[in-house]
Amino acid sequence: MSPPQKPPKLRHACNECHASKVRCSGERTGCRRCVYNQQKCTYSVSMVGKVQGHRRRAAVTGTAPRSGAQSLNINTSTEIISVANADVIHDEANGNDLNSKPNDVPVESSEGITSSPAHCSILPGGNNGKVTTSSAPENFSTSLESIDTSSLETPIIEHEFSWDFSSDERADALNSLALENPSNVDSMKNPEYGDFEYDFSIHEVPATSSSQDDSRSPKRQIADPIPISPVPKFYPSRKRTHSDLSEKQAQHAQNDLRWRSQSQSYKRPTISTQHHNHSFSREMYEYPESSASFDADCSFDRGSTSHSTTSQTNMNHQSMNRIPQTTQSNRISFTAQSHYMVSSMSSSVTHYEASWRFTSKCFIIISKLQKLLRDSSSLSLDVILATNKSAISELAQMFDSTLASNTARSTSPEDFFSIHSEIQPSNTCDTSLSTDFIPLMVYMIALKCIHDLYSQACFIFTQDDHRSRSLSTPSPRNTPSTSNSPFSNPFGLPQLDFGTFKIDIADQRRLFSEIIARELGNCLSACTRLRSYFLMQPGDISTSTGLIEEMFLGIEEGLQSMIKRVKI
C-alpha cells in the first residue's frame, strides 16, 4: 500500500505578481494586489529543487512530458474553509497510477499549506526505491530557497502603522495633531510638556518617566487605544485675558503719567552734591578768580548736569530733581541770600512740567560744554573756544526764539514764563517767587560756567613761566600730549595748544589774546541781553530780582576785567 500523497508546495507569489515582478502579499485566498485590481489570483506549483524539462520527468516517471499546465486556480469569491476541511482531490482516472501527471490540488486557505521544511519537496511516490544518490537535487529541505518565508515577510499593511485605533479613531488620528496627554499626567506640573498656552502634548515619552506613563506608548499599548481630543487643551491660567491686559495698560499709563509729572528729572544723571563738593573744593581754590563766585557751577562734572552747590540754585532745582536738600552746611557765596527763594518750592506740577520743557535744552548744552571743556583729550585751544562759541550761540538763539513778538523788553520773569508756557498764572498760588525764575537761573549758570572756564584759561596764560617759553626751549604748546608739559592742571583743563603745527611763541600769545578777547566779548553781550530781557526797570526791582541782577552784573564785571587782562 503506497503512502498518502503529500500536498504540493505552491509558489509564494501568485502568477500575476510573479509576471509583474512585484512583491506579493501571499494570501492564498487572493493577494491584495489581485483583489485591488479585481484579477484572478492563481498560484502555480513551486519548482524549487526540481529540474524543469522532459529529462527529469522521464527519469522519474518514465513517461513522456506531460501536457497541460501545473497550476492551481483559486477563485477569490469562494468561501474560506478551515485547515481541517481542506481535502486533497485526486484524479479519478489516474487515482492509483502514480506515474501520471501530478494532481491539481485547490487550496482555499492560507493555513492549508504547511511551510515545514520536511514538505518542501514533492516526493515522486512509488518510485522512491529507484531514487539513487544521483538524484540528490531532489532533496532541498535544508536550502534557504526551499523555506517558505511567507509568515516572516508580512508586508506593511495599514493596521500596523495606525496602531490599534478603530476606523473612526484612525481617521481622526491621521488628520489631527492634537493628541491629548495621558490622564494621569498633569501637563501644568510635568516639565516634560512644553510651556505653551496651548499644550498639544505631542512628545516622545522619555525612559526616565516610567513611573507615570511607561505603559502609554502606542507601540506597547495594544488593547487600549489612546484617547483623542479634537480640540487642543486650553489652560486659562497661561492666557492673558482682555481684562488683565486692560488693567495692566491702565496701571502702566497711570504710573507713566505720575512719573512724567513728578520724576522727569531722573532722566538726568545725578551725582551726590556732597561727594562732588569734596572732589573739586581743593582744586577750585588754586586759581585767583576761583573764589566763592566760582562755586555756583562747580557741580557740573564731565557731562553730568547735577544742580549747583549753591543753596539758591539748589532750591530752584529741587522741584526738578526731587532729591533731599543736603547742601545747607556748605559754605558758599549765596548762603546768606538763600532765604529769599524759599517760596519757590511751592510751585505746582503744571508749572514744573512747563519749566522742565523750557530748560531741558539748557541742561543738554551745559552738559556738552562741561564734557568737552574738562575732557583731558581736548588738547587744542581752538577746540575749546569753538565749543564755547557754539554753546553761547545756541543759548542766545534759543533765548531769542522763546520770546514772543509782542513781549516787551521790560517783561517780568513771571509774565515771560506765562507767555512761553502758554499757561496763565493761577490765582490760588503765589507765582511771584515760584519756578518762574528757573529758566533765568539756568541761563545764568550757563554763562557763569563759561565765565569761570575762561577765567581759568586766562590765569594759565598770564601766570605761565616765561623761562619755559624762551626761544631756545621748545614750547609745550606744540607738544601733542600733556605728559611732557611742565604745568599740570588738577582741575582737568588741559594745557592750551594751537594744534600740531609750529608757530612762534609771540604769535601764539597774540592769537591767544585776540581769540580770548573776542569770545569773552560774546559772553559779555549774551549776559547783557539776558539781563535786559529778564529783569525789570531799576525802580521796580524786588529783593529777589535784585539779587539776580546783582549776580549778572558781577559776571559782566568779571568778563570786562578779563578782556582787559588778555589784551596785549
UniProtKB/Swiss-Prot annotation:
InterPro entries: Zn2-C6_fun-type_DNA-bd_sf, Zn2Cys6_DnaBD. GO terms for molecular function: DNA binding; DNA-binding transcription factor activity, RNA polymerase II-specific; zinc ion binding. Residues 470-490 have a biased composition (Low complexity). SUPFAM superfamilies: Zn2/Cys6 DNA-binding domain. GO terms for cellular component: nucleus. Residues 260-274 have a biased composition (Polar residues). Induction: Expression of the botcinic acid clusters genes BOA1-13 and BOA17 is coregulated by BCG1 during both in vitro and in planta growth. It is found in: Nucleus. Residues 242-259 have a biased composition (Basic and acidic residues). Keywords: DNA-binding, Metal-binding, Nucleus, Transcription, Transcription regulation, Virulence, Zinc. The keyword Ribosomal protein does not apply. It comes from the Eukaryota. Pfam families: Zn_clus. Signal peptide: none annotated. Residues 14-41 bind DNA. This is C6 finger domain transcription factor BOA13. It comes from Botryotinia fuckeliana (strain B05.10). The gene is BOA13.
